[in-house]
């Protein structure tokens, strides 16, 4: 499947694609994963979307949004610090201009798998490295599930837990700190040189 992966602010995308992303999030988080989250007109939008985040949109050849990720600096409000501080075991959330938060990862794939992640997801993770290099990001923090943590490790991405797992809703939830270098080492393998 031919895909295009772009990262930009809301203003850099067509409004229809942004709304399609919000609908994808509702399908994945509310419908498929069973999260108890509010939706508006079939779209999952939260207060952090009003703070000028960057979005990764993954689109297929027909320009349909198949996946997304939200990226935000940690210097302002963010999910880990302000919504899920219980995942930090009483410690302060990582904050700094070189530390960004990843949230609202949602994807619909065609079923192709690579080490537990679809090829599409692996390409998206590689784009996180490119974005980090462009923005001077050295670390990402994220609130995710223990299952995703296992998949990251199986892929070879070293992660650091910021606290103990906590059951939130239907998920065993964990906060992770991931260096960009760890992502790069695991998923951005150099191409072999032709002889």
PLM feature segments, named:
Residues 170-191:
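C-terminal "cap" of GNAT-fold acetyltransferases
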Residues 1-47, 57-62:
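Short amphipathic alpha-helix that is part of the acyltransferase structural core
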Residues 59-92:
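Short, His- and charge-rich active-site/binding loops that engage polyanionic ligands
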Residues 194-195:
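Short, cationic low-complexity segments
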Residues 79, 85-173:
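Acyl-donor binding region in acyl/amide transferases
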Residues 39-45, 49-52, 78-90:
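Short acidic (Asp/Glu) patches
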Residues 51-53, 64-66, 95-100:
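Short connector loops at helix/strand junctions that flank enzyme active sites
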Residues 52-56, 98, 172-176:
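Short beta-strand micro-motifs in enzyme catalytic cores
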